[in-house]
Amino acid sequence: MPEDSTAIDYVMEKASGPHFSGLRLDGLLSSPSKSSVSSPSHFRLSNSSFSATDDPAAPHQPFVIGVTGGTASGKTTVCDMIIQQLHDHRIVLVNQDSFYRGLTSEELEHVQEYNFDHPDAFDTEQLLHCVDILKSGQPYQIPIYDFKTHQRKVDAFRQVNACDVIILEGILVFHDSRVRDLMNMKIFVDTDADVRLARRIRRDTVERGRDVDSVLEQYAKFVKPAFDDFVLPSKKYADVIIPRGGDNHVAVDLIVQHIHTKLGQHDLCKIYPNVFVIETTFQIRGMHTLIREKDISKHDFVFYSDRLIRLVVEHGLGHLPFTEKQVVTPTGSVYSGVDFCKKLCGVSVIRSGESMENALRACCKGIKIGKILIHRDGDNGMQLIYEKLPSDISERHVLLLDPVLGTGNSANQAIELLIQKGVPEAHIIFLNLISAPEGIHCVCKRFPKLKIVTSEIDQCLNEEFRVIPGLGEFGDRYFGTDE
C-alpha cells in the first residue's frame, strides 16, 4: 500500500470484482485475482474470495428446530411447508417415530396393550446421539421403523448428511430436557382434538394397516391420556404456538422469515438471542482490515476505529426503549415518530473503554459517563481498583463500553458492580468492537438478560488469552502508548 494512501477507498479499488457498501457478505463472492494475502488458520482476505465468516472452511452449527404437538395435529405438514420455503438450504427432517424401540417377543404378544405414546417407547439416547453427530457436520444413518412388525428394519436405513437446518419432529421431542437444550427454536402445533382424532383414524387405517375399532380403543386408552400427561404440559416450552397447524400459512411464513434471519447470523447469535453483530458490509470489513494491520499509522488507526465505534454505538442505541411521539412539521402536517430514552448513561472500562466515549457523546448530547478500573492480576484474577458512577445509575439504562471482549472476566466484574449498584441486568447494553467466542459464552451464561452489541466475532483466544486474529492491545494503539 502506498505510504500516502491508507484510505479505505484504496482497499476498495484494489480488490477485484464489483463491491457495494450495502451488500451483505452472506456467501462467497469469487472473482479473478492476481495476488492474495491471507492470514493462516483464521480468515482469508484476498482478491479471489471474500467470506463473511471467521473461517470459511470451518463447519457451521446447523439451526435446530423442534416441532411437536398432539398426534395428527399437522406437525409433518408444518415441517413440509418449512422445508419447501427453505429450499435453498440443506435441511434434514428427523422424525421421532424413527427412534421407537423394537418390541420384545413378550410385548409383541400384547401389542394392543403397548403404549406407543409414552416416553419409554422411544430410544432417546440414540436420538441425542443422532443430533450430536449431525450438529458436528457428520453423516448419520437413521433407522427405519416398521409399524406393522413393530421392529426396526435390519437391512435398511435412511442416510442423512451435513446440513444447515435440522428439524426434530415428534409428539414427545419436548419431553426430555436434554433434547430441548439442543433446539434453537421450539414450535408447538395446536389443533382441535376432534380434528386430530379424525386424522389419526385415517392415517392409521390407510398407512399402518389398522382397523377403526383398534385405533379408537388405543386413542381412548393411551393417546388421549398421554397427550394430557406429556404433550400438553410441554407446550409451555414452545417459542412459537401455531393454531390450526398446516392451515395457518401466516404463522409458517413468519417462522420461515425468522429462520432465514437466523441462518444469516453468526453461530453464537443463534445460541444467544441477546448477542447482536452489526450488519457486515465491505466498508465495515475494509475498516476492520485497516485497524487490524500492525503497521497502520496511529492517526489512521484512531480514525477508522472511531468510525467503527460510532457504528457500534448507533446500533446499541437502537436497542433502547422508545416511546411514541407526534410532532408538527414546518408544513403543518403531523409526523408520528418516537422519542429517545431519557434516562441513559455510559460506563467505560478504563482505559480502552475511554476510546469509545467520544462516539457516545457525539450520538447523545450531554450524556453522563461513569468509569470503572479493573486491574488484571495474572491470567484470570481481577481486582476492582476504582469506580465513579452517576449517583442515580440504578434508574438509568447503561451502555457499558469496552472495545475488546476477550475472556469476559473483567466484563463480568464490571457488570456485577453495575447490578450491585441497582442497575437491572436487562438495562445493560455491552458495546465492543470485537468479541472472542469464549468471552461471549462467559458473559451470556452468567448474565442472559443483558445485550451484547459487537461489530465482529473473532475466532478464539490463544494460550496467552489474546483474541485471534484480534487487533493487539487496543488501548495502547489508540492512545499511542504501544512504543
From Swiss-Prot:
Its main location: plastid. GO terms for cellular component: chloroplast. Pathway: Pyrimidine metabolism; CTP biosynthesis via salvage pathway; CTP from cytidine: step 1/3; Pyrimidine metabolism; UMP biosynthesis via salvage pathway; UMP from uridine: step 1/1. It is found in: Plastid, Chloroplast. GO terms for biological process: 'de novo' pyrimidine nucleobase biosynthetic process; CTP salvage; regulation of cellulose biosynthetic process; regulation of lignin biosynthetic process; regulation of starch metabolic process; UMP salvage. PANTHER family: URIDINE KINASE. Residues 274-483 are annotated as: Uracil phosphoribosyltransferase. It is an enzyme of class 2 (transferase). Keywords: Allosteric enzyme, Chloroplast, Glycosyltransferase, GTP-binding, Kinase, Multifunctional enzyme, Nucleotide-binding, Plastid, Transferase, Transit peptide. GTP binds at K298, R307, C341, K342, K343, L344, R396. Involved in the pyrimidine salvage pathway. Phosphorylates uridine to uridine monophosphate (UMP). Phosphorylates cytidine to cytidine monophosphate (CMP). Does not possess uracil phosphoribosyltransferase (UPRTase) activity that catalyzes the conversion of uracil and 5-phospho-alpha-D-ribose 1-diphosphate (PRPP) to UMP and diphosphate. Its EC number is 2.7.1.48. Uracil binds at G472, E473, F474. 5-phospho-alpha-D-ribose 1-diphosphate binds at R351, R376, D402, T407, G408, N409, S410, E473. This is Uridine/cytidine kinase UKL1, chloroplastic.
